[in-house]
């Protein structure tokens, strides 16, 4: 790896970093636990040369997002809000209705909320692929599996 060292600080060039693919199976796992593990990998915090202002993380594939689990009564009581930007345009959905309509949405919303706001966060979010079932179109990638708690 090509890097510039200045005393003890390591500056890694983003084009020298090899991005790997990580697969997380979300079946029967708690939503927040899976989301935090995915964000750690997307940001690159699992690597020794983590830099907060660069995209040094790996790509993440999450399968079985429709089988994700929640604790407590959140399945029927957790409310997701969105606004249409028109007067009186506040809309709300419970976890149940949102996951029936789009099974990957709750996990994507949780991960997007944990990423930095701004251009870097949008770039990191593009490195995430979430699938409702176990079938995915990225079979040609060499990925390593991660067991989330």
From Swiss-Prot:
Single biological process term from Gene Ontology: negative regulation of translation
Coiled coil start-end: none
Gene3D superfamilies tied to this protein: Ribosomal protein L13 (3.90.1180.10)
Pfam annotation, one family: Ribosomal_L13
Gene: rplM
Functional summary from the UniProt entry: This protein is one of the early assembly proteins of the 50S ribosomal subunit, although it is not seen to bind rRNA by itself. It is important during the early stages of 50S assembly.
Quaternary structure, from the entry: Part of the 50S ribosomal subunit.
Gene Ontology cellular component list: cytosolic large ribosomal subunit
Name of the protein this chain belongs to: Large ribosomal subunit protein uL13
CDD domains xref list: Ribosomal_L13
Listed PANTHER family: LARGE RIBOSOMAL SUBUNIT PROTEIN UL13M, RIBOSOMAL PROTEIN L13
One GO MF term: mRNA binding
Family: Belongs to the universal ribosomal protein uL13 family.
Keywords annotated in UniProt: Ribonucleoprotein, Ribosomal protein
The species this protein was found in: Borrelia turicatae (strain 91E135)
PROSITE patterns named among the record's database cross-references: RIBOSOMAL_L13
């Amino acid at each position: 790896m090509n890097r510039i060292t200045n005393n003890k600080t390591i500056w890694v060039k983003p084009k020298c970093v090899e991005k790997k693919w990580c697969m997380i199976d979300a079946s029967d796992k708690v939503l927040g636990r899976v989301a935090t593990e995915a964000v750690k990998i997307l940001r690159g915090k699992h690597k020794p040369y983590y830099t907060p202002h660069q995209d040094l993380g790996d790509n993440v594939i999450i399968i079985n997002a429709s089988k994700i689990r929640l604790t407590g009564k959140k399945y029927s009581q957790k409310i997701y809000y969105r606004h249409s930007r028109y007067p009186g345009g506040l809309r709300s959905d419970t976890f149940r209705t949102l996951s029936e309509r789009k099974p990957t949405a709750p996990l994507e919303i949780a991960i997007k909320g944990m990423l930095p706001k701004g251009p870097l966060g949008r770039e990191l979010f593009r490195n995430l692929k979430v699938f409702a079932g176990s079938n995915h179109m990225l079979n040609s990638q060499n990925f390593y599996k991660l067991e989330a708690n």
